[in-house]
């Protein structure tokens, strides 16, 4: 089977990309799927992508870019700075690369190498649990 070279950028509402749509994308040679909304893919769609070896970028990691840019804007405004597009783009790239690395490393550490959904979930859990522990909550 040859893989297609095109990209598909879908921005759905919650649970809109289902297993049938996932299998259609797989059959047509999709290489990677990155969620661009909050939970747009059903669990069965995600499973289909993972079983087919398709790189899958989960919403919680992929959507962090919007949150990161908002934080950069707040930092820029509070410091009365004016960053160029290139500066913001570089900072965002670094943030997103770090999110990928943390997610990939967490997945690998827990025996799920390549499973970015698992890695993002574990990394998020570990960050929250560490904060709770440091605050004496648990």
Locate each region found by the language model.
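Adenosine-phosphate binding glycine-rich loop
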Residues: 10-12, 23-138
């Amino acid at each position: 089977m040859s893989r297609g070279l095109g990209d598909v950028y879908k921005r759905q509402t919650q649970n809109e990309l289902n297993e049938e749509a996932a299998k259609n994308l797989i059959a047509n040679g999709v290489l990677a799927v990155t969620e661009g909304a909050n939970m747009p893919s059903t669990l069965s769609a995600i499973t289909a992508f993972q079983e087919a070896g398709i790189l899958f970028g989960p919403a919680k990691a992929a959507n962090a870019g919007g949150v990161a840019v908002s934080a950069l804007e707040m930092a820029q405004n509070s410091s009365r700075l004016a960053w160029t597009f290139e500066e913001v783009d570089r900072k965002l790239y670094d943030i997103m690369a770090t999110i990928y690395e943390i997610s990939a490393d967490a997945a690998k550490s827990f025996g799920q190498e390549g499973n970015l959904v698992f890695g993002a979930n574990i990394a998020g859990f570990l960050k929250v649990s560490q904060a709770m522990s440091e605050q004496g909550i648990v």
